[in-house]
Amino acid sequence: MLSFTPSRKLETELRVLQGIVVEIYKNIEQLSPEEAKYLHNFAFVSNIGASTRIENAVLTDQEVDWVDTILQKDGKTTAFEENKKFILDKLEKDRERSVEEVVGCRQMLSTVYLQAKELFPLTEVIIRGLHHDLLRYYPEAANFAGGYKKTPNRVIFINHETGEQRVVLEPSPPGIITSTAMADLVNWYNSNIRENPWPLLVATEFVFRFLAVHPFQDGNGRLGRAHFILTLLQSDDKY
C-alpha cells in the first residue's frame, strides 16, 4: 500500500485528470499511423531533451531529433560508436558529454517504451540494466555504470551567483543499506502497481523513494524520470 492515504480533494483531482487523459486518448486513437508516429517521436525527443538539459546537457530538441534520426537510420547497437565522429563534427567537440548523455538517455527510454510490459515484474537487475544503458556511451562511467554506488553521494543546490551551497538530500549510504532499500522498493512496487486504483500515486511514491536512496553514483535523476514513465506503462490502466 501507499505510505499515505489520498485525501478526498486529491482523489477528486485525480478523477478530473483521468477524465482529461481519457479524452486525449480518444483523440489520439483517431490519428492516422503517420500522425501517431510523428506525435510519438515528438514526445520521445522532447523527453530526452528535457531530461538531459535538467542535468546541464546543452543540446536543443532540434539537435536531439537530428541525433535520433541519424541513429534510427543505422538501427544497430553500435550505431553511436560508428557515427560518433560525424555527430560530434556537426555539433562541435565541446558538446561531447552532452551528446553522450543524450544518446544514453535515448537508449534507456527506447527500452522503456518498447519493452515496458516485458520488464514486469521489476527487478534490481532490470534497474541496473537501464542504468547501464543510460551511461554506456560515457567513458568515465565505465567503472560504475549498472552498479550501485560505492561512495557516499548527496544532492547539493548551488547558487552560482553567490557561490552558496546547500545540501538538499542526504541519501542512503552505500553498501548493505542501499542494497536492502532497493530490494524493499522493488518488492513494494511489484505488489502495488497493478493493485492500487491510482497508478499515478504509485509511480510518484516509487520515484520519490528511489531518489531518496539515490542508489547510483551518477544518473539517478534521469533514471528516476524514466522509471516514472515505466511505472505508468506497466500499470493495468490503458490510459
Please state what every model-predicted region is.
Residues M1-Y239:
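FIC/Doc superfamily catalytic core
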